From Swiss-Prot:
GO terms for molecular function: diphthine synthase activity. This is Diphthine synthase. NCBIfam families: dph5. GO terms for biological process: methylation; protein histidyl modification to diphthamide. Its EC number is 2.1.1.98. It comes from Methanopyrus kandleri (strain AV19 / DSM 6324 / JCM 9639 / NBRC 100938). Homodimer. InterPro entries: 4pyrrol_Mease, 4pyrrol_Methylase_sf, 4pyrrole_Mease_sub1, 4pyrrole_Mease_sub2, Dphthn_synthase. Signal peptide: none annotated. It catalyses: 2-[(3S)-amino-3-carboxypropyl]-L-histidyl-[translation elongation factor 2] + 3 S-adenosyl-L-methionine = diphthine-[translation elongation factor 2] + 3 S-adenosyl-L-homocysteine + 3 H(+). S-adenosyl-L-methionine binds at residues 11, 89, 92, 117-118, 166, 208. Gene3D superfamilies: Cobalt-precorrin-4 Transmethylase, Domain 1, Methyltransferase, Cobalt-precorrin-4 Transmethylase, Domain 2.
């Protein structure tokens, strides 16, 4: 068939693209931009101008979830070199894993260009030890599920931190840090397993990689009544016991939510 590149766009916008990613994007005939797996500040015109500066002139198309899940290979017809640009790291989305498998079955040569992802950047900004993070869970929008609570319980039993990703819909509706805190507290009240308490420490990760990025801490109860702004947002619940270095980082480096905007 041809060559397909899955390119990680990084956390917020085209400034997060690596030099290698830019060279690849400038070399292809068609760039399909994933607009639904996370918030990514890019326009067709801005991307084309950037790639023109690297000697490229690809066609650029912004793609919805339906485009990627149902029409991706139809969109690739007639092109020998195609890139899919997605927020974060391209293989963090299960949709893209399935896409790579199908591409290989169809005879495409696939190359993955990694990018900075929330999976590493959020733990890094929190000051918590990365190897102490357990499974990640997503807190969904308008869906009731005990699964995130189960993941937290499993991680805490193993002495591990938990990263919660907060869903953002294509129409812009999203789960906020406050929504997530209330969600977990309500499930605890219903389940009564003693997995968490309103006084538990939590870390809000807001607009990671954007100019208005904010990483701050508070109790779950405090966060449940705190709206820090626009997506993307994430929530970290540390393990029940912190290492001394982790505790000092939070205390000395991260602000409490009462000391930052909107509080």
């Amino acid at each position: 068939m041809g060559e397909l590149y899955l390119v990680g766009g990084g956390l917020s916008d085209v400034r997060d693209l690596t030099l290698r990613a830019l060279e690849v994007l400038a070399s292809v005939e068609l760039v399909l931009v994933d607009t639904y797996t996370s918030v990514y500040d890019v326009s067709e015109g801005d991307l084309k101008r950037l790639l023109n500066g690297f000697g490229g002139d690809p066609e650029v198309r912004m793609c919805s979830r339906r485009d990627l899940e149902e029409r991706f290979f139809d969109l690739c017809e007639g092109y020998d070199r195609v890139a899919l640009l997605s927020p974060g790291d391209p293989m963090a989305a299960t949709t893209h894993v399935a896409l790579v498998v199908e591409a290989a079955d169809r005879g495409w040569d696939v190359e993955i260009i990694n990018g900075v992802s929330v999976f590493t950047a959020a733990p890094s900004k929190s000051g918590l030890e990365m190897y102490r993070f357990g499974r990640t869970a997503t807190i969904p929008l308008n869906v009731r599920s005990v699964y995130p609570y189960d993941v937290l319980e499993s991680n805490r039993q193993a002495g591990l931190h938990t990263l919660f990703l907060l869903e953002v819909a294509e129409d812009g509706e999203f789960v906020s840090v406050a929504d997530a805190a209330r969600y977990l507290l309500e499930i605890e009240r219903e389940e009564g397993r003693g997995v968490l308490d309103p006084s538990d420490l939590a870390i809000a990760v807001v607009r990671l990689g954007f100019e208005d990025e904010l990483v701050a801490w508070g109790t779950l109860e405090e966060l449940s009544d705190w709206e820090p702004g626009e997506p993307p947002q994430a929530l970290i619940l540390p393990a029940s016991r912190l290492r001394e270095a982790e505790r000092e980082y939070i205390r000395r480096v991260l602000p409490h939510i009462r000391d930052v905007r909107g509080v």
